[in-house]
Amino acid sequence: MKEFDLESYDYYLPKELIASYPVLPKEKAKLLVYERRSQKITHTTFEHVLDFFPKNALIVLNDTKVIKARLFGSKHAFLPSKTTEVFFHRFFKNNTALTQIKGKIKVGDKIFFDANYHAEVLELLHNGQRLIAFYDNKTPLNQENILKLLEQYGHMPLPPYIKRADESLDAHEYQSVFAKHMGAVAAPTASLHFSQNTLEKLLKDFKHAFLTLHVGAGTFLSVETKDIREHQIHTEVLRIPKKSQEILQKSQEILCVGTTALRSVEYFKRLENPNQEAFECDIFLHFANPILHVNYLLTNFHLPKSSLLMLVSTMIGLEKTKEIYKTAIEKKYRFYSYGDGMLIL
């Protein structure tokens, strides 16, 4: 079936449509609304997004907060040039961290961030990740202090298709206005469209629930297997508070703000009698594992051959997805993280 063929999810995108900066004010970003029942497409802007939200739907939002995950250091304590990049992925056991480090590296190597702080490479993992520990002189840092180090010395982890260094505006624009729990290394991008004013109106007028999926670096990876069913998707840390779990269990109609919220809901709703708040989410949604519990989705426009494009295709069909993306390109919609959005009803 073509739905399982990786090449079915390829498309050409002119480079000028890859958004390098956000639209400001946020409400001026374009929004494509697609109503599946009537197959009607409406072109509007985010200042009208809540007008299209179904009144009885539960709105689910991901309140993860992006950390400054990119660090630059030197392999020698007294060298002023910091040319070794460390990309923090997530915490591991005993206050260690999973990272990617550019360039040649071996176990025992140290990377210095200033006169006091450094990291030591503990293990080279098979998937290209490096297990490291952070230190203040000879004292190991705990998770709280590692986050403080990242906040002080780190850079916002802009996606690889944004071909510029991070700037001061990214510290707040590559972060949703309701971001709360630190841990993501990529923003849940549909959330970026909400201004404080739009959020307050949503919280006042709609049933809503928050969850936290710490978006991992794997979100940018293309699927590589010719048959998409053979793809092993990345695992991400998910937390759903008991209050949100209760609301989700009772709700019949759900609208997710972003694919991360949708994947979280689908993962949770398939569990039998969940009795905890913390999970490891590794759900991959495609035509052989379709969406079962979410009715509507607000999302951005996604990369070719990405698992997120496959997710969207399961909601509206492969051919309709291609047709809508073609329309968006013709109408000069801006794509990817800082781009415009699409509401599927």
UniProtKB/Swiss-Prot annotation:
Stretches assigned to coiled coil: none
Cytoplasm listed as a keyword: yes
Pathways per UniProt: tRNA modification; tRNA-queuosine biosynthesis
Cellular compartment(s): Cytoplasm
Keyword Cytoplasm: yes
Keywords: Cytoplasm, Queuosine biosynthesis, S-adenosyl-L-methionine, Transferase
Enzyme class, broadest EC rank: transferase
GO molecular function, one term: S-adenosylmethionine:tRNA ribosyltransferase-isomerase activity
GO cellular component, one term: cytoplasm
Enzyme nomenclature, EC number: 2.4.99.17
GO biological process, alphabetically ordered: queuosine biosynthetic process; tRNA wobble guanine modification
Function: Transfers and isomerizes the ribose moiety from AdoMet to the 7-aminomethyl group of 7-deazaguanine (preQ1-tRNA) to give epoxyqueuosine (oQ-tRNA).
HAMAP family: QueA (MF_00113)
PANTHER family: S-ADENOSYLMETHIONINE:TRNA RIBOSYLTRANSFERASE-ISOMERASE (PTHR30307:SF0)
Name of the protein: S-adenosylmethionine:tRNA ribosyltransferase-isomerase
Gene name of this polypeptide: queA
